[in-house]
Regions:
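Structural marker of alpha-solenoid helical repeat scaffolds
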Residues: 11, 44-45
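Short, conserved micro-motifs composed of acidic
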Residues: 18, 28, 32, 45-361, ...
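Short, ordered, surface-exposed loop/turn motifs in non-cytosolic proteins
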Residues: 237, 367-383, 454-472
């Protein structure tokens, strides 16, 4: 594709859409400097293009993602085949996944679109940090079409999974004749699936034959179901949505995760860890390849800034579908990177969200002397407090802040007797190892005398305080022998 786009560019000007595709291909092939040059060319003619701006705002982003290679680790697992293996999730002591290895229900049926075997659900035993002994699941779940990405509600003993929108043998096709994806669920008892052939299978109430609904992911408390859909109201190709559990097998109206998470591209494979972190895959958030793995924290006010998990979890290939075990650090993901057995392979991983260190000093603006004991906080480029930042105050006014990657930071500081001040940092252009935060002393003056209310005699040793407009104490002192005070 890269050669074809290069030839097209040599023949004449490309459209903006073709230029973006060309830049994305360059990025996917690991040619990051050339990709940045292409994005810059697009920006010259379309300066308000949101997707292009996101890449240009962090021109060295790709190199920094690749450098952070020691925090995460990747390992192979012995359950892959020569076909596609993907769609991982965890059910108690089992790893569930989808495979096109052709050992499923009905034999090796082929999907006409790509002449590949239909996907079926398999299980494998979790053993430490790996999985072994893959085994195809029963026909209570698998059928002769696609059966894919699943999620397990351990509290309700219920499995939600993606399949072609087929129920009781009826193909629920769109008006165009296309068979879309839907979510279905079945309950499990005593570690076994329901013995009813299809009686235990229930369609998700928000399935619709006119659009795809899939990639379900239940929150650890079972109160929210996340899923992927191309339904109306989204921002791009496929968006991440969620529904609240209303009880009695009812779900609230689907809500879109919003512009923090969803883009003009495709977001897929949501997964929520025990510490309220949403992991997902995207081909439009700035990343190393086609699809990268990302995360953001879920807060009462909404999702935090989206962070790329970096290399080696992400490469120039398609890396996606990250899930974690109960320890929130050991997990699995899917990639089509080189060196695998099939078109898609399952990999084990150890995950630590990427962080970077900001170092600096707090000083008096006039005297340039170090200020000890200042209180700092840090916000991202959207003005949100970065609650997961680790701020350490050292001697001589020095500080260290370990913080996730972001496009911009604002560090603010204060101390009694000083005005609050902040410094903005662009990690793409500003040094992160010598940040200066300058604080100004309050510019005030006040003097007076404290006297006895009746005798009018000066009072010695009376405590006097100076407060700001918010009743915050700025300074206190005691009166001199003549009853006078001076601030």
């Amino acid at each position: 594709a890269e050669a074809a786009y290069k030839q097209m560019a040599n023949m004449g000007p490309l459209s903006t859409a073709d230029m973006i595709d060309y830049a994305d291909v360059l990025r996917g092939n690991g040619h990051y400097n050339e990709a940045i040059a292409q994005y810059q060319a697009i920006s010259a003619s379309d300066p308000e293009n949101v997707r292009v701006k996101s890449y240009l705002q962090q021109a060295d982003f790709f190199m920094r993602l690749k450098r952070d290679s020691t925090r995460n680790s990747v390992r192979t697992v012995p359950i892959n085949s020569a076909e596609a293996d993907l769609g991982v999730t965890v059910m108690d002591d089992l790893l569930l996944f989808s495979s096109a290895r052709g050992e499923g229900i009905g034999g090796k049926n082929e999907y006409q679109w790509d002449e590949q075997p239909f996907l079926n659900l398999y299980t494998a035993l979790l053993k430490g940090q790996t999985a072994v002994e893959p085994y195809v699941m029963r026909k209570d779940v698998n059928h002769r079409y696609h059966d894919g990405t699943a999620t397990y509600d351990s509290l309700a003993k219920r499995l939600y999974f993606t399949r072609d929108n087929v129920f009781y043998g009826t193909l629920n096709k769109a008006k165009s004749g296309e068979l879309k994806l839907g979510i279905f669920y079945t309950d499990i008892t005593a570690g076994e699936f329901s013995q009813k052939e299809w009686g235990g299978l229930v369609p998700f109430e928000h399935n619709d034959p006119e659009f795809n609904t899939g990639h379900p992911s239940i929150s650890p408390d079972g109160k929210r179901l996340y899923f992927v859909s191309d339904r109306p109201g989204g921002r791009g190709g496929t968006d991440i949505w969620y529904c609240e559990n209303l009880g009695n097998n009812k779900w609230g109206v689907p809500s879109n995760m919003g512009e923090k998470v969803n883009t003009s591209g495709n977001e897929m494979y949501p997964f929520v860890s025990g510490d309220s972190v949403l992991y997902f895959s995207s081909n439009a958030h700035p990343g190393l390849g086609g699809y990268d793995n990302f995360y953001c924290r879920l807060t009462p006010s909404g999702p935090s800034a989206v962070i790329n998990l970096g290399y080696p979890l992400n490469t120039r290939f398609d890396d996606r579908n990250l899930i974690l075990l109960k320890d929130d650090s050991t997990g699995f993901f899917v990639s089509d990177r080189t060196g695998g057995q099939g078109s898609d392979d399952i990999y084990g991983c150890t995950v630590h969200p990427p962080m970077q260190m900001i170092r600096g000093r707090v000083i008096d603006k006039k005297s340039r002397e170090a200020i000890n004991g200042a209180v700092l906080d840090i916000k991202d480029g959207n003005g949100r407090f970065m609650d997961d930042a680790k701020i350490t105050m050292l001697e001589d006014g020095k500080f260290e802040i370990e913080v996730p990657f972001a496009n911009a930071y604002a560090i603010s500081g204060t101390k009694n007797g000083y005005l609050q001040n902040s410094v903005s940092i662009d990690p793409n252009t500003d040094p992160l190892d010598d940040v200066l935060l300058e604080l100004d002393k309050y510019d005030y003056g006040a003097e007076g005398i404290v006297m006895h209310g009746e005798t009018m005699a000066p009072l010695t040793g009376v405590k006097v305080g100076l407060y700001d407009a918010n009743d915050k104490l700025i300074q206190d002192l005691t009166t001199a022998a003549d009853g006078k005070y001076t601030f």
